[in-house]
A protein has these predicted regions:
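Bacterial Sec-dependent N-terminal signal peptides
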Residues: 1-26
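Structured catalytic-domain cores with a bias toward divalent-metal coordination
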Residues: 17-304
Length: 304
């Protein structure tokens, strides 16, 4: 009798420790509630991921390191078995959002991604896949909210500021690390050692028909086989996979009021001051996403 009582007690304890079943309707983002014209505030972001962490065994939100704003950097992670300890035998993706908080597309896209992973709308069973995202890298800029510093951009209604709490452009500080943000990024990056790195941005001016473009790190900067994989496998696969989609993707161009050279466009050189240039120093395959600022915010987020 005592044995059965013990087993029953253990089952009750285990059941009480399980997180409740996630209801996606309780995790609608501000982007979705506004029909694609608004982005989440910093407070809404952190609250969203805290609730998602509580609702799903497969999601974890962790404060890691400090930022110049005095608030910590937050990392959100997904693993199908709730194994968040990065290891060599895992396939690891790291996403960076909100380095320029006025370019908020990746912030909202990631909220929906992690919600859909947790609710299994996007079904991933592979226990070796670890997806991590910096919720918002430029916390100080996210808190400095306005509607005027990206006047030529087609939404959202309000957004954060490009400079951080000390007015640094964080996408020029990765190798120099003058800011607490950059030092905390290094802590996150080297603790995960990601195979793939994606940094989400919005373009600043050149006009073209594409909603979304990509900017891969230079393949010839990477070790031979790795560079060949980026150039001959990953980039072509991404372009082909999105070719039949509503949002085809093409290489990023940045020209202002001049005709391109007859030989073609020059590729953006991602020095180590930039995120993908920094991560390529450690043989991580890097890609910067650039959505087009003149396209509607809803399309930009959905394409991301």
């Amino acid at each position: 009798m005592k044995y059965f009582q013990f087993v029953a007690l253990v089952l009750i304890v285990l059941t009480s420790c399980q997180k409740p079943v996630l209801n996606p309707e309780e995790f609608q983002t501000q982007f979705e509630k506004s029909d694609g014209v608004e982005t989440a505030t910093y407070a809404e972001l952190i609250d969203f991921y805290k609730r998602l962490d509580l609702a799903s065994e497969n999601i974890r939100l962790t404060p890691i390191g400090q930022t110049d704003s005095g608030k910590p950097l937050h990392l959100v992670q997904f693993n199908a078995q709730g194994n968040f300890a990065a290891s060599k035998d895992q396939y690891k993706l790291l996403i960076n959002n909100g380095i320029h908080p006025g370019e908020s597309d990746g912030i909202d896209a990631s909220m929906m991604l992690f919600r859909d992973l947790a609710s299994e709308k996007i079904k991933i069973d592979n226990p070796k896949l670890l997806i991590s995202a910096i919720v918002v890298y430029n916390v100080g800029g996210a808190l400095n909210r306005n509607s005027t510093t990206r006047a030529n951009q087609n939404g959202p209604v309000s957004y954060g500021f490009r400079g951080n709490a000390r007015n640094f452009d964080l996408n020029r500080d990765f190798i120099k690390a003058d800011t607490e943000n950059a030092r905390s990024f290094a802590q996150v990056y080297h603790s995960i050692k990601p195979d793939l790195f994606i940094d989400n941005h919005v373009s600043n001016g050149a006009d073209y028909q594409y909603v979304i473009t990509h900017l891969f790190t230079q393949h010839n900067k990477l070790a031979g086989p790795l560079g060949a994989f980026l150039d001959q496998t990953w980039q072509p696969y991404l372009e082909q996979a999105m070719a039949g989609d509503k949002y085809p993707i093409t290489p990023y161009v940045n020209v202002f009021g001049r005709t391109p050279d007859p030989k073609g466009f020059s590729q953006f050189m991602d020095y180590p001051r930039y995120s993908t240039g920094y991560t390529s120093l450690f043989n991580t395959l890097g890609m910067m996403v650039e959505t087009h600022m003149l396209k509607p915010y809803k399309d930009r987020v959905l394409s991301t």
